[in-house]
């Protein structure tokens, strides 16, 4: 026999706390756009799908970190070299020669950002000269089309289809008045004529308090359809 508390719980309108299925909760059913729905991969996350389709999940810069691209192999060089090889002296000699060759390379001031500088040293570590950068972050004289062409990435097929869909001409369908609306406008016209102010203050016919401008637009459309000349 159940207790009084259990019987009250069974009669209560508050639903029981049941276990939710996370897979059903997270599943996305795309119905808004057929192009995106056809190319959506449900095994990927939303951000991964947007990146695959050539779209952006967020218009602004992401506040947090980005997902690591595992397709690119980044080789990490240790800061300190372990002393394991017998040919350490030869390696050090090669490193010094490489450093000297790098130091003798001419630095281009047009490749260094404006406001920054590069120090050029000799093989002994002494400063030879300081090269100040002249490369501007944004050139006002540069053509806008060149900037756009440089910044834009290659469009995917999904983006091209979406642009074609968005560029189609939209056929505007004019709103038609219903029979009840025409009967209501006819009553207003027979009672008040072209006096839209009296129509506005008519509490029996104008129960939804339509404004004078709205009543005028509706009546002009109704007159045009019924062939009534406007005064």
Curated annotation (Swiss-Prot):
It is found in: Nucleus, Nucleolus. Its main location: nucleus. Keywords: Nucleus, Phosphoprotein, Ribonucleoprotein, Ribosome biogenesis, rRNA processing. One of its GO terms (cellular component) is nucleolus. One of its GO terms (biological process) is ribosomal large subunit biogenesis. Residues 1-10, 17-27 have a biased composition (Basic residues). The modification Phosphoserine is found at residues 176, 178. PANTHER family: HSPC111 PROTEIN-RELATED, NUCLEOLAR PROTEIN 16. Belongs to the NOP16 family. Involved in the biogenesis of the 60S ribosomal subunit. This is Nucleolar protein 16. It comes from Saccharomyces cerevisiae (strain ATCC 204508 / S288c) (Baker's yeast). The gene is NOP16.
């Amino acid at each position: 026999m159940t207790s009084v508390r259990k019987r009250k719980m069974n009669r209560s309108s508050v639903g029981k706390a049941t276990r939710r299925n996370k897979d059903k909760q997270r599943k996305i059913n795309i119905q808004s756009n057929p192009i995106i729905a056809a190319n959506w991969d449900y095994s990927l996350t939303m951000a991964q799908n947007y990146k695959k389709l050539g779209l952006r999940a967020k218009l602004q810069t992401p506040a947090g970190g980005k997902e690591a691209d595992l397709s690119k192999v980044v080789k990490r060089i240790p800061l300190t070299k372990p002393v394991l090889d017998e040919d350490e002296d030869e390696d050090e000699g090669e490193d010094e020669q490489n450093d000297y060759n790098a130091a003798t390379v001419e630095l281009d001031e047009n490749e260094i950002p404006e406001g920054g500088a590069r120090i050029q040293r000799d093989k002994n570590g002494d400063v030879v000269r300081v090269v100040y950068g002249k490369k501007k972050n944004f050139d006002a004289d540069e053509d806008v089309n060149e900037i756009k062409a440089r910044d834009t990435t290659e469009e995917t097929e999904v983006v091209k289809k979406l642009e074609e869909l968005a560029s189609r001409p939209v056929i505007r369908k004019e709103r038609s008045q219903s029979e009840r609306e025409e009967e209501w406008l006819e009553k207003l016209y027979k009672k008040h004529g072209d006096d839209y102010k009296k129509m506005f203050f008519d509490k029996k016919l104008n129960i939804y308090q339509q404004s004078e401008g709205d009543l005028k637009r509706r009546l002009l459309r109704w007159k045009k359809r019924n062939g009534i000349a406007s005064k």
